Curated annotation (Swiss-Prot):
Main location group: cytoplasm
Statement: the UniProt record of this protein carries the keyword Protein biosynthesis: no
Sequence positions that bind substrate: R58, Y195, K201, R321
Protein name from the UniProt record: Phosphoenolpyruvate carboxykinase (ATP)
Residues annotated as binding ATP: 201, 220, 236-244, 285, 321, 440-441, 446
Entry annotated with the keyword ATP-binding: yes
The protein's role, per its UniProt record: Involved in the gluconeogenesis. Catalyzes the conversion of oxaloacetate (OAA) to phosphoenolpyruvate (PEP) through direct phosphoryl transfer between the nucleoside triphosphate and OAA.
Disulfide bridge partners, by residue number: none
GO BP annotations, alphabetical order: gluconeogenesis
Length: 530
C-alpha cells in the first residue's frame, strides 16, 4: 500500500470547517485555551502540567484494527492486533464524529510523520481538548507556514474524543476506551482516554504497517550521529539505558524513539520527544530537564501551590511524561535524518548476570536477538524477595507491530548485509551474580564500550567465542577491566554461573518457539551457542 492515499474527508471537513474549530493554533494560543478551559496549570518552569484521569498509560487491550478486505491478510492478528469488523467501526466512527460536531470548540493540527519527504505521512489531527492539540503540535512534524498546513491533504487523520465513552455492548469495544486503526478509511479513532500517548503510538503503529509494506524499515529505537557522519541506532526496552546512552554530548541526536530506514538513510518519524519525567533531575539528565519550559506539556506530575514541580512524586503514576518539540534539545540534527547506520546497539538489562557486557553479533545472531527483544524486569514476590523476571518484546516494540515479526527481522537482516553494519549486544544489567548478589555494570564502563563500538575501534579487535552462549567477546577494550568482559570470570562460583546461564538460554528457546517454523533458519544460526 502506498502512503500516498488519503482520508475520506466529507464528515471530517464539516468538523474542520465549523466556525468554532481552531486551525493550527500556536503554542501561546493553545496555552490560553488550556488555561481558560481549566485543562491544565502553569508551572514555575513555564510548562503546562495536565492530568490524564484514570488512564495514565496506553490501553493495549482496547486497541483494534479494522478487518478490511484489502488489508486483513497482511495483519498479524492476535492479542496485540485485535480485529474489529468494518460495520462496527463505521457505526462508532460516525457516533464520534456526530459527538464532536456538537462540541463548542475543536482544535485542528496539520503536519507530518517522517522527516524524510520521500517517506513521510501527511497528517491531520482533530482534538476535543486544547492540550491534546498542543501535544500533537509538539510530537509531530510541524509545517513551516500556515499556507503549507492548509494545503496538506492528509494520508491519515487522528480523531480524538477523550470524553466520549463507548458502550461495549453497543459499540463492540471491551470498555469505554478505544483506539481503532482503519487502513481503508485512513483514520485512527481514539475515545474514552485522555492519555495523549495513544496518538503518538497510533501513528507509529500506522507507520509500522505502511513503511515495511514498501520495504522501508520502521524501528522502535533512538539514533544519533557523530561529527564524521557516522550513525548509530540504539534498540532497547524500558530500563536498559537507551535514552541515557544515546544522549551523548559528542554526538547529535536524530531522534529518541521512532525511526525509519529507507534508501536515503535513517530518519526520525517524529518532531518531538515524549520523555519519562519521574525522578528527573538537572544533574542526571540536563538535556531533558532544560526542555521543560514554555511550550512543553507535563503529564501527571505533581506541582505545589507555588508552581514548583516535584518530579519524584508518583502520586498519580510512575509514568509521568514530558512532551516537547525536538528542537528544545540543543544537540540535534536538523532536519532529523542522517545517512545509513554504521553501528547498531541492542541494549539489554540482564538481571541474571550472565550475558557479556558487550559482544559482537553476526547477522543471524542480530536477527535472533531483534526478534527476541530481551531484557529483565524486577518483580516483587509475596514474601518480599525480589527476583529477576525475563521480559521479551518482539523487535523491541511488540505492541506497535501490525505485521508479522519476521517482516521486520528480514528487512533488518537485508539492511545489515547491504550496508555492512556492525551490531553489538550490550548488557547494562548485572555482573558477578544475579540481581541481589552481583552488582550493576558500571555506567562509566558501558559508555566506554559503546563509544569504542560506535567509533569503529572494536570492528577489527580480537574476539573469543564464549563456550556458554556462543557470543563473540572482545579480548580487550581500552579503559575497561578485562575481568568483566567474560561474565563467567566475574562469578565466584562457576557452576552457579553455568546453571544460571543455561536457565536463561532455555527461556530464550521457549520464547522463540512462538515464531514457529518460518524462523527456523534464524534459530539454527542465530540462537545461543550455535
Amino acid at each position: 500500500m502506498s502512503i500516498d492515499t488519503y482520508t475520506e474527508t466529507l464528515k471530517i471537513n464539516q468538523l474542520i470547517e465549523k466556525a468554532t474549530s481552531h486551525f493550527q493554533l500556536s503554542s501561546t494560543q493553545l496555552y490560553k485555551k488550556i488555561l481558560k478551559n481549566h485543562e491544565g496549570e502553569l508551572t514555575e518552569l513555564g510548562a503546562i502540567n495536565v492530568k490524564t484521569g484514570k488512564y495514565t498509560g496506553r490501553s493495549p487491550k482496547d486497541k483494534f484494527i479494522v478487518t478490511e478486505p484489502s488489508y486483513k491478510d497482511n495483519i498479524n492478528w492476535g492479542d496485540i492486533n485485535q480485529p474489529m469488523d468494518e460495520e462496527t467501526f463505521l457505526k462508532l466512527y460516525n457516533k464520534v464524529l456526530d459527538y464532536l460536531n456538537q462540541k463548542e470548540e475543536l482544535y485542528i493540527f496539520s503536519g507530518y510523520a517522517g522527516s524524510d519527504k520521500e517517506s513521510r505521512l501527511k497528517l491531520k489531527v482533530i482534538n476535543e481538548l486544547a492540550w491534546h492539540n498542543l501535544f500533537a503540535r509538539n510530537m509531530f512534524i510541524r509545517p513551516e507556514s500556515i499556507d503549507e498546513a492548509q494545503n496538506i491533504k492528509p494520508n491519515f487523520t487522528i480523531v480524538s474524543a477523550p470524553h466520549f465513552k463507548a458502550n461495549p455492548k453497543l459499540d463492540g469495544t471491551h470498555s469505554e476506551t478505544f483506539v481503532i486503526i482503519s487502513f481503508k478509511h485512513k483514520v485512527i479513532l481514539i475515545g474514552g482516554t485522555e492519555y495523549a500517548g495513544e496518538m503518538k503510538k497510533g501513528i507509529f503503529s500506522v507507520m509500522n504497517y505502511l513503511l515495511p509494506m514498501q520495504d522501508i524499515m520502521s524501528m522502535h529505537c533512538s539514533a544519533n550521529v557523530g561529527e564524521k557522519g557516522d550513525v548509530a541506532l540504539f534498540f532497547g526496552l524500558s530500563g536498559t539505558g537507551k535514552t541515557t546512552l544515546s544522549a551523548d554530548p559528542k554526538r547529535k541526536l536524530i531522534g529518541d524513539d521512532e525511526h525509519g530506514w529507507n534508501k536515503n538513510g535513517v530518519f526520525n518519524i517524529e518532531g518531538g520527544c515524549y520523555a519519562k519525567a519521574i525522578h528527573l533531575s538537572k544533574q542526571k539528565e540536563p538535556q531533558i530537564y532544560n526542555a521543560i519550559k514554555y511550550g512543553t506539556i507535563l503529564e501527571n506530575t505533581v506541582t505545589n501551590d507555588d508552581g514548583t514541580i516535584d518530579f519524584d512524586d508518583n502520586t498519580y503514576t510512575e509514568n509521568t511524561r514530558a512532551a516537547y518539540p525536538i528542537d528544545y534539545i540543543e544537540n540535534i540534527v536538523t532536519p532529523s535524518k542522517a545517512a545509513h547506520p554504521n553501528t547498531i546497539i541492542f541494549l539489554t538489562a540482564d538481571a541474571f548476570g550472565v550475558i557479556p557486557p558487550i559482544s559482537k553479533l553476526t547477522k543471524d545472531q542480530a536477527m535472533y536477538h531483534f526478534l527476541s527483544g530481551f531484557t529483565s524486569k524486577l518483580a516483587g514476590t509475596e514474601r518480599g524477595v525480589t527476583e529477576p523476571q525475563p521480559s521479551f518484546s518482539t523487535c523491541f516494540g511488540a505492541p506497535f507491530l501490525p505485521l508479522s515479526p519476521t517482516k521486520y527481522a528480514d528487512l533488518l537482516g537485508n539492511l545489515i548485509d547491504i550496508h555492512d553494519v556492525d551490531v553489538y549486544l550490550v548488557n547494562t544489567g548485572w555482573t558477578g551474580g544475579k540481581y541481589g548478589i552481583g552488582r550493576r555494570i558500571s555506567l562509566h564502563y558501558t559508555r566506554e564500550m559503546v563509544d569504542q563500538a560506535i567509533s569503529g575501534k572494536l570492528k577489527n579487535t580480537k574476539y573469543i567465542k564464549d563456550d556458554t552462549f556462543g557470543l563473540n567477546i572482545p579480548v580487550q577494550i581500552d579503559s575497561v577491566p578485562t575481568t568483566i568482559l567474560n561474565p563467567i570470570n566475574a562469578w565466584n562460583n562457576k557452576d552457579n554461573y553455568k546453571a544460571q546461564a543455561y536457565d536463561l538460554i532455555q527461556r530464550f528457546n521457549n520464547n522463540f518457539k512462538k515464531f514457529g517454523k518460518e524462523v527456523e533458519h534464524i534459530a539454527n544460526k542465530g540462537a545461543f551457542n550455535q
